[in-house]
């Protein structure tokens, strides 16, 4: 399988992997009933006809099913991965072979990453995208910061706070020189809205809303119950240990594992390690989450307590500097350190750059400290489940990506009469329940139906929604 004749608007590792990718996409479709049902229901209506979606989300087999669902609903699409290690090269090749522009290679450099992100916004045939589908907020940030600099506020470009910002800001400077005047303003004016996949990106959106700088309506997909309580929890429960095992071949049973953070991702991560036979420690800043962890039987400690005790360390907080250089110096020889939060700054990887690095295999490095102690770092502190393994299973991603599809429809086709302002929204409870319902038959669930008198007794409709908006699942 090769790309369509004359189509070369893509960058992938090896287009000859497309046939392999297509076979795996076919397998994944069987495990993604929500997306397939969405194609069947909405395909004839073409609600995304005319939509030009700039997608920045891990270019995996499951994402390929999402991309082809959006296309089946009428959208024109350009796609990049939102992490330098998360691309599955056969998935990217299959999408390119289908004639959809994609720019994604597993192990791309930071310079490549930001160059590819910029390519999202130069639409083939001219023009710009009118929708963003984001994971982590980098595509959204590219436009916001590009417009800020274009409008004259450029001081921040000379003050990068990380290696990644240094590369990103250099790209923005280049764009300001090479692109026509008003380039970012034209992109910003074209876009109708953004749907955001993950916790980190949602934090960025709420920060912009609070500051009054959010350029378009946004839908927070992450806080749909059928995303956060399934993808974040059950997805991590399966994929975390998969990544650690593939990276290290270590025996998990009997090891002491430390999980930083006990939100939904941390809960899934702790369960993953416990099921593998680890003795699990947890750290938390939130007394409610700390109490939950203790009631689940985990020992709640600080990172300082855990550093000399644990064999395996996992960060899952969405915050920065969770594992510091001081913590790493206190660890056992060849402790395994990894992250399952979106960005690599949960671990102070930058502080290790001047130490001796020995690459064991792709995304597995041994770092030697001056005293001879060694540490195993997975995926350079980026997402371990996607860098060292294949990410979450297809079934749980079907729920997340069905929410993404419905969010794109809401913002593009259903934003009538100013329904959505320049604010952050969540999908209504009725759609959350719909997404769940679409996945029941696949796993043999028989749903009990309320009788009319029962529905009246608890004050709900027979067909739902069954819970109030403030209900915590």
From Swiss-Prot:
Supply one GO molecular-function term. adenosylhomocysteinase activity
What does the record give as the function of this protein? May play a key role in the regulation of the intracellular concentration of adenosylhomocysteine.
Official protein name in the record: Adenosylhomocysteinase
Give any Gene Ontology cellular component. Answer: cytosol
Q: Which PROSITE patterns match?
A: ADOHCYASE_1 (PS00738), ADOHCYASE_2 (PS00739)
Q: In which pathway does it act?
A: Amino-acid biosynthesis; L-homocysteine biosynthesis; L-homocysteine from S-adenosyl-L-homocysteine: step 1/1
Q: Does the entry feature the keyword Signal, yes or no? A: no
Q: Which residues form a coiled coil?
A: none
Q: Which domain of life is it from?
A: Bacteria
Query: Cofactor note, please?
Result: Binds 1 NAD(+) per subunit.
Query: Which reaction is recorded as catalysed by this protein?
Result: S-adenosyl-L-homocysteine + H2O = L-homocysteine + adenosine
Q: Where in the cell is it found?
A: Cytoplasm
Q: What is its EC number?
A: 3.13.2.1
> What lineage does UniProt assign to this protein's organism?
Bacteria, Pseudomonadati, Pseudomonadota, Alphaproteobacteria, Hyphomicrobiales
